[in-house]
Design a protein with these regions (language model features):
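Juxtamembrane intracellular "pre-TM" segments in multi-pass secondary transporters
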Residues: 4-22, 201-243
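Pair of pore-lining "gating" transmembrane helices in MFS-fold secondary transporters
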Residues: 13-48, 121, 234-255, 334
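Hydrophobic core of transmembrane alpha-helices in multi-pass small-molecule transporters
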Residues: 30, 112-129, 328-342
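A single, central transmembrane helix in multi-pass transporters
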Residues: 30, 175-182, 221, 225-290
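Intracellular juxtamembrane helix-capping segments at the cytosolic ends
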Residues: 43, 129-142, 342-355
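Loop-to-transmembrane helix entry/capping segments in MFS-fold secondary transporters
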Residues: 54-55, 144-154, 272, 357-367
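C-terminal transmembrane bundle of multi-pass solute transporters/carriers
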Residues: 70, 81, 85-87, 91, ...
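Hydrophobic alpha-helical transmembrane segments
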Residues: 113-118, 124, 149-208, 276, ...
Length: 425
């Protein structure tokens, strides 16, 4: 009996999530996210104040996102063969240096939109490589059975970073953007130093080296890896359906992201603060949603149904909330926050658990590129249409397209998507 009881306790006791490496990557993420949230929103305000144009604001977003259309696919196969950890902390050191250079340019009064565009393009390039490396390395630091809990923490941290947005606006309106850039210089440097102390073994590198004899030469190896990555995506109908849907979701998100802040600034007095109130409730919703997912496991056999419900409801809420009074917008955005973190948690934990470690780089690279193409199309089309069409109508149309994609791509692909979503992870 004692032996059976001990065995039962072992089975019921989950693996510890908060290992040394997971703690380091989490703290490092918090530090860098805080800096990014501060400077990112301030840069958006700077572009709007400098250009006075919704289209130019959309163009700024496109310039930042453009590298994501190509770079993830190019770097994905290489990140399946080389150290993702080293890539992560190296890029954080580079980001720290770049923000220091941008600070110096602004202090020397050399600012111009072309310089800002070049800086945004470089930051976008770094970001596009970083997130493929991070998304592929992060699962290696999660102990078995803790994927859902770990990704609920990640989504909650992103939400907490949004708390810095009001501070960003206050600092920007008071003393300008330079102090925020200098703060970002420090946060990225601290995060990079912390990440150098992660000790996880990257065993997938040896696996890839052992299987690399079939292809020789850098270009031939890259072509072979990229082809295999695409073949893998097409061979997995569930992953393909998820990827296609999130292209449409990214399209709608790109349209919304490009038009919402300009809409609030042009519609309300001190519109950036009204924007923060409304979208701040979304952050609160994401925080509460993340806490719920950390404490409560979704029923395994209902995950697909929950995800489809979330996709449809998000489309309806985000497509209509701008037609209501501010207090109603806040309530609707609170709901969007809770549902958004649910969508993220189900998708990321399921796909990262499903895809083998040695294929994660290629899958995440391809998935990221497809999402970026959707976002870029949404930003460009929405920005151009906003010059002569009502902003709210454009956003509603984009969300209606997203709604149709949820029904026809995810709904009709239920048989294959369930195999990925309805799994304990």
């Amino acid at each position: 009996m004692a032996r059976q009881k001990g065995k039962m306790n072992n089975e019921l006791s989950p693996n510890p999530l908060w290992t040394k490496d997971f703690t380091i990557i989490t703290i490092g993420s918090v530090v860098s996210m805080l800096g990014s949230a501060l400077s990112g929103f301030a840069m958006s305000l700077l572009v709007l104040d400098y250009t006075k144009s919704t289209f130019m604001f959309a163009l700024y977003n496109v310039i930042y996102m453009l590298p994501n259309a190509v770079v993830p696919v190019l770097c994905g196969p290489f990140l399946d063969r080389f150290s993702r950890k080293r890539t992560i902390y190296t890029l954080d050191f580079i980001s720290s240096a770049l923000y220091l250079i941008l600070s110096a340019i602004l202090m020397l009064d050399l600012f111009s939109f072309p310089i800002l565009a070049v800086g945004c393009f470089l930051l976008g390039t770094i970001s596009s490589v970083y997130y493929v490396a991070y998304d592929s390395f992060y699962p290696l630091l999660i102990t078995e059975g803790n994927y859902s809990k770990a990704y609920s923490i990640a989504s909650t941290l992103e939400t907490l970073a949004m708390i810095m947005i009001p501070i960003s606006a206050l600092v920007y309106n008071s003393v300008g953007i330079v102090p925020l850039f200098l703060f970002n210089t420090c946060t990225y440097f601290i995060a990079a130093v912390m990440e150098t102390h992660i000790g996880a073994e990257e065993k997938y590198i040896e696996k890839q080296k052992q299987s690399s004899s079939e292809v020789s030469g850098g270009i031939r190896r890259f072509v072979s890896d990229f082809r295999k990555g695409m073949e893998y995506l097409y061979s997995e109908k569930g992953l393909l359906a998820i990827a296609i849907y999130f292209v449409f979701s990214s399209f709608a998100g790109g349209a919304t992201g490009s038009l919402t802040l300009p809409y609030f600034k042009s519609t309300f007095h001190n519109g950036e603060y009204v924007y923060m109130m409304v979208w701040g409730m979304m952050a609160v919703g994401r925080g509460i949603g993340g806490f719920i997912h950390y404490k409560v496991r979704l029923p395994v056999q209902r995950k697909f149904v929950i995800a489809l419900f979330v996709y449809i409801t998000l489309s309806l809420l985000e497509g209509s909330y701008l037609y209501f009074p501010v207090w109603v917008m806040m309530i609707m955005c609170f709901c969007v926050g809770i549902l958004g973190v649910t969508s993220y948690n189900i998708r990321i934990s399921a796909t990262q658990h499903y895809v083998p470690d040695e294929r994660k780089g290629r899958f995440n690279g391809t998935f990221g590129t497809l999402n970026t193409l959707g976002t870029l199309c949404g930003q460009l089309i929405a920005g151009a249409l906003a010059e002569f069409l009502p902003v709210r109508a454009i956003i509603s149309s984009a969300m209606f397209i997203n709604l149709l994609a949820a029904i026809f791509v995810i709904g009709f692909g239920a048989k294959h998507v369930k195999k990925i979503y309805n799994v304990q992870n």
